[in-house]
């Protein structure tokens, strides 16, 4: 039984991020617990039936995905050329996804870089760290980040560093030297979005950099496609400007007094509460002195190596606070970091298993689904989405693990399995969570937040339009963003209408029906945007609603989704009983 409890702890929310721990505030704790049904339903006959169905259906889903993508399928010759030699039981591996292939092929190199970076940091910390977890004023952590980051950028992007520097320079000038608050905000956003289009149109241009070319040509670094990772750089650029503009507006002419507070805080004398013991939410708007918004911290933040390639996203205020003022207690708990590393390793091995036994990415690239049943096509799409989830989760967790070892605690990006979602709103809170928090802080709240009625829809439309453009300047992704907003409308409307009936016995079952509709709509939106494209989606919809076998599958799968939704509801009820409410 002890082994089961340890296993449960390993896969709990709390292991991922201390931000997900039960609240310590007794009033909030009781209010969260009161939301839950005090009696667990796991031992009831209803849920025993649900769990039995789950045990039967999940293996059938795996079997269908394997049959539609393995060498026994008649379409195998059409995608065989995309497979590579694997290392599990002599099987081929589907390494055809460009993004994950880059990560997978360079994984040993990344591990070596992590070892070098963390070792250097520990050696330097031996000389500069103060026992109470704060830092020496003579040599701040950000100095090391600045030096290492510049070296890393040159090694990664070579001569293309000049192109990145151009955007950094323009953005810095906008933030620091446009003194009108609204104009600075507008210029920051306009240039930020323009830079995405600029890179799309002119990213491969030399811009006169040929003067640096030697006989062997450009040195473009280990990662020549600098523009692929620029999107994350842009988020940090915007964060610096918007944090600075907001802070400058609040401070007015009182920066001199705050500089004095900063000095007192570092030296430990009469520590002011403004810069001590801030939690993760308070760090987002940490009352930093204006002189912390300098070019050195700007470049150090932009080029912070553990999070540079793909995040998770951490705001400028949070980064500087953790770097130069107070280290997060999470980064000093090595047992927790070890458990996080074990969980990362588990996810990595699951990904390797799926890539060796389900070639769904190769199938989707070649559209090799002729003759497949609606069940098989839907499983191709579903496991494709699972692989997309894993290909994002694994790098994010590796980079977050790297940051934790380095003493910085960024938010966890993925706190739910992709299949453990029934709400479109909650899905976006759990998927790419740090980006979601960034969007809420810098776009959603400034635009008016949730509000009511049409304004909530308009804000959501603006948010998902930016999200789509930020991912890639491609029409199908913009359509995906608008589809998501359209699919949000029924959920928002139903929540407003039926939430007052939440004490009725039938409310849970009504929510289950709504969850089934939500899951279908989310799958359609994401399959169009990221997996099957419009061709594959239209074929699936045609087979579902214009063939007998498809109609039968639609009914059975909807029943299974209802069962899954009820299990998801009870999982969240179990969390509420432990005073955990992550709202997703």
UniProtKB/Swiss-Prot annotation:
Function: Membrane-bound O-acyltransferase involved in the remodeling of glycosylphosphatidylinositol (GPI) anchors. Acts only on GPI-anchored proteins, but not on free GPI lipids. Also involved in lipid metabolism, having profound effects on sphingolipid-sterol-ordered domains integrity and assembly. Involved in cell integrity and apoptosis. Plays a role in virulence and antifungal resistance.
Originating species: Candida albicans (strain SC5314 / ATCC MYA-2876)
Keywords: Acyltransferase, Cell membrane, Endoplasmic reticulum, Membrane, Mitochondrion, Transferase, Transmembrane, Transmembrane helix
Membrane-topology descriptor: Multi-pass membrane protein
A Gene Ontology biological process term: filamentous growth of a population of unicellular organisms in response to biotic stimulus
Disruption phenotype: Changes ergosterol plasma membrane constitution and distribution and presents an increased resistance to azoles. Impairs the development of hyphae, adhesion, to invasion, and formation of biofilms, all of which are significant virulence factors.
Active site: 471
Subcellular localization: Cell membrane; Endoplasmic reticulum membrane; Mitochondrion membrane
Protein name from the UniProt record: Membrane-bound O-acyltransferase GUP1
Stretches of the chain found on the membrane's Extracellular side: 1-41, 131-145, 204-295, 365-373, 531-550
GO cellular component terms attached to this protein's record: endoplasmic reticulum; endoplasmic reticulum membrane; mitochondrial membrane; plasma membrane
Assigned protein family: Belongs to the membrane-bound acyltransferase family.
Pfam families hit by this protein: MBOAT
Cytoplasmic side, ranges: 63-109, 167-182, 317-343, 395-456, 499-509, 572-584
GO MF, one annotated term: O-acyltransferase activity
Transmembrane domains' residue ranges: 42-62, 110-130, 146-166, 183-203, 296-316, 344-364, 374-394, 457-477, 478-498, 510-530, 551-571
């Amino acid at each position: 039984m002890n082994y089961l409890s340890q296993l449960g702890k390993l896969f709990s929310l709390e292991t991922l991020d201390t931000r997900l721990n039960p609240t310590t505030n007794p009033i909030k704790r009781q209010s969260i617990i009161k939301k839950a049904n005090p009696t667990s339903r796991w031992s009831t006959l209803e849920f025993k039936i649900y769990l039995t169905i789950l045990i039967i259906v999940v293996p059938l889903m795996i079997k269908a995905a394997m049959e539609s993508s393995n060498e026994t399928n008649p379409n195998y010759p059409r995608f065989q050329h995309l497979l590579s030699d694997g290392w599990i039981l002599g099987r081929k591996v589907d390494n055809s996804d460009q993004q994950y292939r880059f990560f997978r092929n360079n994984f040993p190199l990344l591990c070596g870089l992590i070892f070098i970076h963390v070792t250097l940091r520990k050696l330097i910390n031996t000389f500069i760290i103060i026992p109470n977890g704060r830092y020496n004023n003579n040599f701040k952590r950000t100095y090391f980040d600045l030096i290492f980051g510049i070296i890393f950028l040159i090694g990664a992007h070579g001569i293309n560093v000049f192109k990145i520097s151009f955007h950094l320079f323009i953005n810095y000038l906008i933030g620091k030297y446009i003194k009108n608050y609204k104009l600075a905000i507008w210029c920051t956003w306009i240039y930020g979005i323009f830079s995405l289009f600029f890179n799309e149109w002119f990213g491969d241009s030399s811009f006169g950099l040929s003067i640096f070319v030697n006989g062997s040509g450009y040195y473009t670094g280990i990662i020549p496609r600098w523009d692929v990772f620029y999107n994350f750089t842009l988020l940090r650029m915007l964060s610096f400007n918007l944090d600075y503009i907001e802070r400058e507006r609040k401070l007015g002419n009182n920066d001199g007094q705050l500089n004095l507070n900063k000095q007192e805080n570092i030296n430990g004398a009469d520590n002011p509460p403004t810069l001590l013991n801030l939690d993760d939410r308070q760090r987002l708007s940490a009352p930093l002195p204006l002189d912390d918004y300098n070019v050195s911290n700007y470049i150090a933040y932009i080029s912070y190596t553990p999070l540079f390639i793909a995040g998770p996203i951490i705001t400028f205020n949070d980064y500087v606070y953790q770097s130069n003022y107070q280290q997060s207690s999470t980064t000093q708990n090595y047992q927790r970091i070890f458990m996080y590393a074990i969980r990362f390793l588990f996810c990595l091995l699951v990904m390797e298993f799926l890539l060796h036994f389900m070639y769904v990415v190769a199938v989707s690239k070649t559209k090799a689904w002729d003759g497949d049943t609606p069940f098989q096509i839907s499983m191709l799409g579903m496991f494709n989405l699972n692989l997309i989830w894993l290909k994002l989760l694994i790098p994010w967790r590796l980079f977050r693990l790297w940051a934790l070892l380095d003493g910085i605690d960024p938010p966890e990006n993925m706190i739910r399995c992709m299949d453990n979602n029934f709400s479109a709103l909650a899905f976006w809170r759990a998927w790419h969570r740090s980006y979601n928090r960034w969007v809420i802080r810098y776009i959603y709240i400034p635009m008016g937040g949730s509000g009511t009625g049409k304004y909530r829809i308009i804000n959501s439309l603006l948010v998902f339009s930016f999200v789509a453009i930020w991912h890639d300047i491609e029409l199908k992704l913009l359509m995906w963003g608008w589809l998501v907003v359209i699919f949000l409308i029924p959920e928002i409307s139903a929540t407003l209408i039926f939430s007052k009936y939440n004490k009725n016995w039938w409310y849970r079952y009504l929510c289950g029906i709504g969850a089934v509709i939500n899951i279908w709509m989310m799958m359609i939106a994401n399959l169009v945007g990221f997996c099957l494209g419009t061709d594959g989606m239209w074929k699936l919809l045609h087979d579902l609603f214009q063939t007998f076998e498809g109609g039968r599958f639609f009914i059975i799968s909807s029943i299974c989704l209802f069962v899954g939704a009820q299990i998801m509801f009870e999982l969240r009820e179990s969390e509420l009983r432990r005073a955990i409410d992550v709202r997703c």
